[in-house]
Design a protein with these regions (language model features):
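Internal acidic/polar
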Residues: 89-118
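C-terminal flanking helix
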Residues: 26, 30, 51, 136, ...
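DNA-recognition helix of helix-turn-helix
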Residues: 80, 127, 139, 145-148, ...
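Structural recognition of an alpha-helix C-terminal capping motif at a helix-to-coil junction
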Residues: 45-52, 65-77
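Short, charged helix-capping/linker segments at alpha-helix termini
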Residues: 11-20, 30-49, 164, 186-187
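Arg/Lys-rich amphipathic alpha helix in sigma70-family domain 2
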Residues: 59-62, 76-94
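Sigma70-family region 2
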Residues: 11-12, 51-66, 85-87
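Short helix-capping/turn signature of helix-turn-helix
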Residues: 24-27, 35-36, 125, 144-151
Length: 187
């Protein structure tokens, strides 16, 4: 099934087209989400939300970009929304603890292994993802899409709605920052 047929099938409510979409893109969407949220359960939730949003809003897809670009954009946005809500909950939890009202522990990121990274040692994988988590938002997105999802700079620029030179700059700064973070940890 080519992309045009898939889009037409999705817009007509064809169940087989939706199943094909999920089967084709679920691993890629999950890998993108886990690269950003760094939690397997949250990444699964994000992936489900992406497909629900596609199901509900496919009629709004104008075809100005590839379907995969649209999916990555939704996955990135949903992942960032989750991180932002998590940060606001952490801030609120800190305020509650200051005033003695918060009895629940703050959410901590568990250790996990990203399915898209094949490293010999789990320790290296954990260090890498800890370092990626410290990157500024746009650098984290560009790095995740390029290194974990193997998207080209052109594809990343479409997902992030920016220019290719901007993506190149983000990748350069992400690599520099990761190098600094990882060097600091080995000292």
């Amino acid at each position: 099934m080519n992309e045009l047929e898939l889009i037409q099938g999705l817009k007509s409510g064809d169940e087989a087209s939706f199943k094909y979409l999920v089967d084709t893109y679920q691993d890629r969407i999950f890998n993108t989400a886990i690269g950003i949220v760094q939690n397997a359960e949250d990444a699964e939730d994000v992936a489900q939300e992406v497909f629900i949003q596609v199901y509900r809003s496919i009629h709004g897809f104008k075809g100005e970009s590839k379907l995969s670009t649209w999916l990555y954009r939704i996955a990135t946005t949903r992942s960032l929304d989750l991180l932002r809500s998590r940060k606001s909950k952490k801030r609120f939890g800190f305020v509650q603890r200051l005033f003695g009202d918060g009895n629940e522990p703050l959410y901590e990121l568990p250790d996990f292994n990203h399915p898209g990274i094949a490293l010999d040692r789990k320790e290296n994988s954990a260090k890498l993802f800890k370092a990626i988590a410290q990157l500024p938002e746009n650098q984290k997105i560009a790095f995740t899409l390029h290194k974990l999802e193997d998207l080209s700079y052109q594809e990343i620029s479409e997902v992030m709605e920016t220019s290719v030179p901007a993506v190149e700059s983000l990748m350069h700064r992400a690599k520099q920052n990761l190098r600094k973070i990882l060097e600091k940890e080995t000292d």
